[in-house]
Amino acid sequence: MSSTYSSIQRHRKDTSSSGSNTTPLARRRRFDEGPADPGSAPHLDSFVVPPTRHDDGTKRQPGRRKQRWSHGENKVADLLQMPTALTGHLTPEQAEAYAIYYRIEEISQQLRLGDIVPPEDERSPSPPPQYDSMGKRTNTRDARYTRQLEEERHRLIERAQRLIPNYRPPVDYHKPAKTQEVVYIPVNEYPDINFIGQLLGARGKTLKKMEQESGAKICIRGRGSVKQGKGRTDIPFQSTAEDDLHCLIISEDEEKIARAVQLVQQVIDTAASVPEGQNELKRSQLRELAALNGTLRDDENYGGAPQSSSGDEMDDRNKRRNNFMSSIVCHICGSKGHFARDCLEKGTNAGTSENADREYDALMRELQGEGVIDTASQQQSIAQNPNTNNVSKLPPAVTGSNAAPINMRKPMSERGGSFDRFDRGGFNQSNQREPQQQSHQQNMHNTNGNNYDRYDRNFNNSSNSSPELPPWHRPTPPSQPAAPPWLRRDNYKKHDKVSVQQSMQQSPWNRDTRQHQHQHQPPVHHQSMFNNNQSPIGPPGMSSSGFGGYGGAPAGVPGMSVPPGPPGLSKVPPPPPPPGVPGMDGDQPIRHPPPPPPGVIGPPK
């Protein structure tokens, strides 16, 4: 009994330590004993080590521990059965072509077998998950490595088609529509440089130019590529909105992508290494932007002349600038050296009024039967008589002058209410008129019925005539008898009346119809000289008998007879003239202003 209790206490003492496994697997071996009986030990084949699992949940059987100098098993290489040790003599081009062909076949075999995920120690960190509009994850491990293998195979196939003659891609290869490349912009290293502005250029022209040169599509993506408040809602853009600022280059050809990458990298390197004041790309962009906005200064030396420029160069610049300005002709005034938008006579219609006067003179000459002015004959006459004043009447195009035509026409506010159609000058006083108008007025003073003949003769000889006398020194024209009432044309308007003296000078059937239809109205201030109120007597060749005691038409006019008077009118005497009217009663002579005293230059006041 005591021996049993002592053995139990000894067993508890041996198993009292925690975490110890004191249960023997076999019979204790003693030094003095022989080897243990292997049959007495428990059988270990029944214990199975559970397999480990990958991160994605796939089972992985334990194998031999991999060492750094050991090579793993390559199932794809075993399936290809292609030699990897080249013992023959190959050129570098042949060796490169064989390596490309081998890698293409290896990738194709991996895609067929689905062995696309590399071992765990060769993987890169997984990116944040991304989901589509349906909530399905798009950047799984299999999708990412499959995309990488397909892009690598596409690049290798394009190289193989250029290096290997008559090369045919694998059967399961489908050429993608477009490939893309990413070029990151170092905004974190250079925060003060506007890379986006230099990549885009003025209104995006620099970016369009790079796209035309390379043939690839260039886009700017990432943080900072879109202004705040102008975000886009499309899913592809939102997927890269939080990435670093970069240029996304898309094309179907690898060479185009390489060319676009080179151009983009060149702009980035220039902006980061060249100072802002010496960056020619930025200067040209600013100049182009100013031209588009309309604020460009069109100078030969934009931005100031360099300090090292010599005097000859400055003279050449000034000559070129002066030649350019002298070639500019204003179409408003005809002068040189300024544009029409800068003309001082813009809106004054100077050339229009001069042309209107010239056209009016030509019209009057044509109506008078003199015809249109022949500029060739007039130039010849001016060349023969250089002292004439007709040069001023020629247009600048005939005289060869570059000066602007002078506007001699008075404004409408200074013309007054007169119906004087000959008052077209720019002078304020009535006696200070152009030679043409003064000669015309003098002819109207001296006319004796044949107005147009004298007017035409004096107008043609006005340049060679003697200086005119002032109005108070001119001789008084002879008085003419007033026309009878039946020859007066009071039913016409005031400015269309015909001169009474012309009606008395010639008979209506002997008068020139051409001159009768185009008579001029004398000025208002000369009408008093033609309206001399004399005693109503019959014109020469007419009888004293007629209507109311006035002279009537003579009998015997071819085809006409004396019309009888109205009933009762022949017995009524004419009404007496109003008292005090000179020239009506025949006793009072016509009064004229007295001549000025000696030594007085101006007219009497």
Curated annotation (Swiss-Prot):
Biased composition (Pro residues): 468-484, 561-581, 591-605
Biased composition (Polar residues): 376-392, 428-445, 499-510
Compartments it resides in: Nucleus
Upper taxonomic lineage: Eukaryota, Fungi, Dikarya, Ascomycota, Saccharomycotina
Similarity field: Belongs to the BBP/SF1 family.
Domain KH: 184-264
ZnF CCHC-type span: 328-345
Sequence ranges of Low complexity compositional bias: 446-466
Origin superkingdom: Eukaryota
CC terms in the record's Gene Ontology section: nucleus; spliceosomal complex
Protein name in UniProt: Branchpoint-bridging protein
Disordered, as annotated region: 1-75, 117-139, 294-319, 376-605
Organism: Yarrowia lipolytica (strain CLIB 122 / E 150) (Yeast)
Gene that encodes it: BBP
Keyword Ligase tagged: no
Annotated S-S bridges: none
MF annotations from Gene Ontology: mRNA binding; zinc ion binding
PANTHER family the record matches: RNA-BINDING PROTEIN RELATED, SPLICING FACTOR 1
The entry's keywords: Metal-binding, mRNA processing, mRNA splicing, Nucleus, RNA-binding, Spliceosome, Zinc, Zinc-finger
